[in-house]
Swiss-Prot record:
It comes from Archaeoglobus fulgidus (strain ATCC 49558 / DSM 4304 / JCM 9628 / NBRC 100126 / VC-16). The modification N6-(pyridoxal phosphate)lysine is found at residue 209. It holds the Pfam family SepSecS. Keywords: Protein biosynthesis, Pyridoxal phosphate, Transferase. GO terms for biological process: translation. This is O-phospho-L-seryl-tRNA:Cys-tRNA synthase 1. Its EC number is 2.5.1.73. CDD domains: SepCysS. Converts O-phospho-L-seryl-tRNA(Cys) (Sep-tRNA(Cys)) to L-cysteinyl-tRNA(Cys) (Cys-tRNA(Cys)). It catalyses: O-phospho-L-seryl-tRNA(Cys) + hydrogen sulfide + H(+) = L-cysteinyl-tRNA(Cys) + phosphate. Pyridoxal 5'-phosphate binds at residues 78-79, 183, 206-208. Belongs to the SepCysS family. Its cofactor is pyridoxal 5'-phosphate. The keyword Protein biosynthesis applies.
Length: 371
């Protein structure tokens, strides 16, 4: 019942390529996987103050340095981090401006926080880019409708893997006196990212998507000036931070995040290799008639493809639109959702050159088989 069929497959699912556990994390999971075992020696009622295991050092020393921020916390996911920021800044009839490529959880978090939402439009096919100019125009127009208490940029987005010019967007937001939150769920842990270098106010990441941790867990960083607002304390339970509901990621999630952290800290230094690998993959897919959409040349391992050749095959092949999933599965390749043939996304993060070639050859074989 609990056997995972795809465990030993080549995994190209963007949700999972950056979240594969390290061997150190697997060992820590066995050691600390029982319930709240990390709370064995909690004396203050605060997760971030636990010193055995060294959670305090991780959250207050290592994580801020890694994120390039003043203050950091762990959350139960990037979406919970986004909501914490939005809810703490929300006012009656206020607005949040976010890019049209945003993850659905960004939009839902804003709705839950009671904020009005203005979307920065993306450019047309095939780039789907978010530009600083469109960001400025949307903020300008939205300010006429009410107070803009926050802006959010997705870096990169989870559809196309586009990396917008986040520094210019941060400058735009600063000029309009609007704090900026960077959703780096597919960036932090894969590539070098620094809140201070970007010039934004908040940054959130995903441990299970991009930091080799069990899910769900997120990270949140901010400038010192926002800590008093976002991390305000309960009136009755003086040690509890309200937006975090006291404590967040307890148990297997925090311990695997910490155990993988030394590896994650090192792997981001090899980001250029991951980009080159993705570009090589995209170029070879183009030779098969499968077009890579979004930034081109691409700057991230998450890629979105338009495959008319596969779509045409699906009209005639046995199994219809599920033929591609089944063909890849038979070759022990996992990650493209069942039923997708015309448009799909994938990630080459962490794959060896041999695995990349194997996946490319699989697509070539499939197309030749049905031609």
């Amino acid at each position: 019942m609990f056997k995972r069929e795809t465990k030993d497959f080549i995994n190209i699912d963007p949700l999972q390529t950056g979240g594969k556990l390290t061997e150190e994390a697997r060992q820590a999971l066995l050691e600390w996987g029982d319930g709240y075992s990390v709370c064995d020696f909690c004396t203050t009622g605060r997760l971030d103050e636990i010193k055995t295991p060294p959670i305090h050092d991780f959250i207050h020393n290592q994580l801020p340095k890694f994120l390039g921020c003043d203050v950091a916390r762990v959350t139960n996911g990037a979406r919970e981090a986004k909501f914490a920021v939005m809810h703490s800044l929300a006012k009656k009839d206020a607005w949040v401006v976010m890019d049209e490529n945003c993850h659905y959880s960004s939009y839902v978090a804003a709705e839950r926080a009671g904020l009005n939402i203005a979307l920065v439009p993306k450019t047309d096919y095939p780039d789907y880019a978010i530009t600083p100019e469109n960001f400025a125009q949307t903020i300008e127009e939205t300010k006429k409708r009410g107070e803009v208490v926050l802006a959010l940029i997705t870096y990169p987005d989870g559809n196309y893997g586009n990396l917008p010019d986040v520094k210019k967007i941060a400058k735009v937001c600063s000029e309009y006196d609007v704090p900026l939150l960077v959703n780096g769920a597919y960036a932090i842990g894969r590539m070098p990212v620094s809140l201070k270098e970007i010039g934004a106010d908040f940054i959130v990441g995903s441990g299970h998507k991009s930091m080799a941790a069990s899910g769900p867990i997120g990270v949140m960083g901010m400038k010192e000036e926002w800590a008093e607002i976002v991390l305000r304390r309960s009136e009755k339970y003086k040690n509890k931070e309200v937006e975090l509901l006291g404590c967040t990621a307890r148990g297997a999630t925090i311990i695997t995040l910490m155990a993988s952290f030394p590896h994650v800290r090192e792997r981001i230094k090899r980001w250029d290799e991951e980009v080159e690998k993705a570009r090589r993959f995209a170029a070879e897919m183009e030779k098969l008639g499968i077009k890579q959409l979004g930034d081109n040349p691409h700057n991230h391992d998450l890629m979105f493809f338009h495959a008319e050749v596969l779509y045409e095959i699906s009209k005639k092949a046995k199994g219809g639109r599920f033929f591609l999933y089944r063909e890849l599965k038979s070759r022990k390749i996992h990650g493209i959702k069942p039923g997708l043939t015309r448009y799909f996304k994938l990630s080459t993060y962490g794959l060896s050159d041999e695995e990349v070639d194997y996946v490319l050859n699989a697509f070539k074989e499939i197309i030749e088989k049905y031609s």
